[in-house]
């Protein structure tokens, strides 16, 4: 799918053409703030008038910072020339575009002059100011440009006024963020970089969203549940004498975020009726509190972006501008992923090929993906995924390609993406990252089932192509959940430290001088955290290991992340942190599925599981006779791969690592594309007919999943690797400690993928040799202020009764004494 804007040309100025365009007023979108004052002249009519006026640039004078902008907007002399060039480019773009997407009449465009809202001395209200720069004024204190933590902008377009309230997205860059470029053939590294990337909302519009960068004008988008608006500055139309910078703004229908989508994280997949036809997405119910679910827990995808040489040349041969473009794109992607997938996209590095391309740039994305995968293995920076942005037009049906489910892998956690406008690249990058996360493309036949029919914008992973979509369908979200449940994405659970900016309360990262930081208010429990300080008596404010009523750590051994399968490891609280430990799984080679499978990369690999994943729940692996009979023949029906036009015979030792043979195949695979036809084969063996069918099923990255997966068992203590059957010991994995009897982890634990012992419930130590007493896993409930006990009540009652009796008896005795005195007092008058 190639989104609009994937071409390197500037966007068209439709909706403000100088001939034949309607310049009448337009109705504003629902939820936008109507412009005050008299009706505003439409931008196209204003442009015609201003272009006919004598040039005013020479008479303009630079004003001091903070001076008010004049009431009339000002356009410089180059505007008309550049608008003509842009119009020509628009015609060329629409005539020559290879995209399979039709430009919709619903898209509208205008020219606007945005302004930043500031406060003047002795004024209580904001006023518009034409300078859009958000750099803090006292830069000499810092070794890099520092931008304001908060900013507001006013944009008038389509008959409405929008006020955008922004907060610096301090979750975008990690503390280890580095920028790389080349000089004299050698890489040059620099820590940090300019950070001008904001998230926010439209003032007064509920559930609105904004993602903008302000490094060089305004780049990005905002939406109000009805329309999506894309904004960027017009190139070469602005100079220092200008009183305002023209921007082009596009309006198109937004994806409708239904209530079901907003509440999706609280629902179980098997509650949706359409999933009866998506059985492969279903998994067992998890006996764990949903608040500790692996999908609901926030995840962090650490991303590295690489820009090719043509992308660098496009940005005026400035690696700073090129890097800013990449950061702007990732800022947009992060705004999509964190809301719908509970996943933050954190940029750890940007590399720009300033001198030459480091790999061959071709129009064949499959070839380029394979070459880039080899290059990625030479990169030293840690990243969960590395993606290339290339200013090339692929001879391919889509604008990106990545390895399906490849995140966390140094060889497969990569992707290649076409360059274009920021919003278009953000959508392309969202799609290729989704492929890395096990999310499939959605053919049009699945669109009604996946709930992508509510809006013109469609969904991100639609195969037919959509324009500026920001919505993942139900199917996509369930596939991501399924990917996590199968053990994928283990690297996504290590929370990176906050970026290099100064400490700021409210960004969601606990920094120097802070005890807690709620970020968005919903991230903290109750009253545990106030102004980035823990409340009196509180030990924590958030996380699966923080008691949400007492604000105390859960006890050591309290389960905080359930194992999602036999090859996963349950994580337990440490007793001294509110956060759950990193997500680990068993080391490759452990037996699973009743000794029928082997753990590999956190998944239980069996031929049955692979057949069901490709062909549905009724499929199963064929009888061993099929593999021994067919894979030794070296034909289309059975082989160990292909060398040119020749099928490779499997040795008898490797027959279970060759062509995948299954029973009960469906007409079409659940993933990938069928290459050729299904090869039905059957034999009469030991008094019964056995099914030995197979097929070549190819993913977009050219991977043929019609062969037995790596990690699948092929004999006692043996597993497949690169279509060879190898001893597990030959994999040279790091080993965990052994006891004197040679038992791993003393026989009281399992070895993790980090070669550390995860001990059983009552054992501890690096080798699990120390007996640990049973822990209290159920912390006492918060009972509030302690009241009197039953014993104290009884004692108090008895004491009270004795005291009352004493008072009564004493009073009676005193009264009796007085009676006696009155009876025998000789001075007393009257009868007795």
From Swiss-Prot:
Changing residue 566 to A: Significantly lower of adhesion-promoting activity. InterPro entries: ADAM_Cys-rich (IPR006586), Disintegrin_dom (IPR001762), Disintegrin_dom_sf (IPR036436), EGF-like_dom (IPR000742), EGF_extracell (IPR013111), MetalloPept_cat_dom_sf (IPR024079), Peptidase_M12B (IPR001590), Peptidase_M12B_N (IPR002870). The chain crosses the membrane at residues 793-813. Residues 814-832 are cytoplasmic. GO terms for biological process: cell adhesion; cellular response to leukemia inhibitory factor; central nervous system development; proteolysis. May play a role in cell-cell and cell-matrix interactions. This is a non-catalytic metalloprotease-like protein. This is Disintegrin and metalloproteinase domain-containing protein 23. It comes from Homo sapiens. The lineage of its organism: Eukaryota, Metazoa, Chordata, Craniata, Vertebrata.
